[in-house]
Every structure is written in C-alpha cells, then in structure tokens.
Amino acid sequence: MKLSVIICTKGRPESLKRALQSLKQQSFKDLEILIIKESPLVKARDLGWRKAKGEIVSWIDDDVILDKDWAKSLVNIFEKNKDIGGVSGPTLVSEKLLKNRLVFWWFGKESWWARLWIKLVLDGKPFVVGKITKIGWWSPGSNFKSCLKLKGLQEVDYLEACNMSLRRELVKKAGGFDLKYQGTSEWCELDLAMQVKKLGYRLVWSRRVKVEHHVSRSGAFIKRRNWGERINNYLKFRKKHI
C-alpha cells in the first residue's frame, strides 16, 4: 500500500527541513512526498491529494517532526481495517509552545473565564481526543502528553489537521476539500474528515501515529490574526455538520 505525504508550506524553510528529515528516517519506505506552495491553504491541501498517487494520502504541517514508525503504524491500520476511512494520532505540543496557539489561551489558568470556556466550549473535557463538542468546537486532547496513555484504536469525530490520513478513493468520493473556507482555512480539514465519516467509514486515532508539533509563529500563523475569517470558517462548519 503506497502512502502519499502532502506538506503545504510557506515561509518556513527551516521547519520544512526538519519535517523532511523525519520523513527520510521513516521505517516504512514506500512513500511519495509532495510539497505544495499554493495559497490559500485549502487550495494547497486540495491540490495535494489530486496530484497524489498513493492509496493513502496524509497531510502534515511543515512544522511537525514524525515518529520514525509513524508511516508504518498508519499504513498497518488501514491494511488491517477495511472499514476505517481515516487515521490520526498525537500532535504533541510542548507547554512552552502552547502559547503559540491562541486556542490554548485557557491552559494553566484559574480565571472564571477559563473555567467557563472549558465548560461551555469544551464540554468540560479539555483533554479528550478527537471529539466535536456540542457547539461544534474541537477537543484539543491530542496536543497533550496525557493522550499517550490511550491504548488501542480510539473512535473519533475528526482528524488532526497536522496529522491527517485518509483513503484517497474516499477523498475523491467526498469531493475533496470545500474551497469556500477562507484564510488559513481552519475547519476545512475537519469538514473533509466528517464528510468521509458520513460515507459510512470509521475515523480512528492511535497513539502510535505520533508527531511532535513545533508550533511556529511564522508563515501561515500570521494569518490567524484575522478573526473575521476564522469565525466565518467556524460558522460554515457548524452549519454543515452540527
């Protein structure tokens, strides 16, 4: 089973170099690597799978470092489980780098606002992996080391954007990415994963499909300051799936 790995990148050459080095060191060797520099991000992600030749397509960010058995583990899951359409895993972020992601502003804080956010937005379970909450937000548990305690395959609602693998034939059936997502295109990945799930296939998470996410403040990160686009993306996702 051939695996195509898609890296969408812009303005982060050093991060990209480290990501490619971790791909070079993979124990599984039947890899196709596609580096896509299109903009916006959703267009780059969509172009990647259309160019890919593998039965499995994976999207990783240019600022991740892959565990050496990352590819071997996810391909093994797909080969043994024909009813699985998508696979994801830990996207570990060090506590030092959590500040580089605005969605983790609540971590380590005791304010009433942080407690309210955890209760209302994260359903009171901030360390769960792969779940869409009642209001249509995503649970961030995959970013924390505590997720490594989870054994076996975990059934999930979505796949992590920087560590997402799908059967190419199902991506095609789902129509690929919705190109109407704006800016950094947040939620477009969740959207596609859920479209695949609606085709009748399982989405799973495994601790063996592990990456370290060295969250960068350059490149696409700068566009995350456009809250108008981010909110529009969230509302679009919510309207389609919640």
Per-segment meaning from a language model:
Residues 186, 208-211, 220-242:
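Catalytic core of nucleotide-sugar-dependent glycosyltransferases
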Residues 69-131:
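Conserved donor NDP-sugar-binding/catalytic core segment of glycosyltransferases
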Residues 124-165:
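A recurrent flexible, glycine/aromatic-enriched loop bordering the glycosyltransferase active site
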Residues 157-166, 170-175, 181-209:
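A short, conserved alpha-helix in the catalytic core of glycosyltransferases
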Residues 38-52:
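Glycine-rich, basic loop-to-helix element that forms the pyrophosphate-binding segment
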Residues 57:
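Short aromatic/hydrophobic "clamp" motif used to bind/position activated sugar donors
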Residues 21-30:
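Short, acidic, metal-binding catalytic loop of nucleotide-sugar glycosyltransferases
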Residues 2-4, 32, 191:
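Cell-envelope/extracellular polymer assembly enzymes that use nucleotide-activated donors
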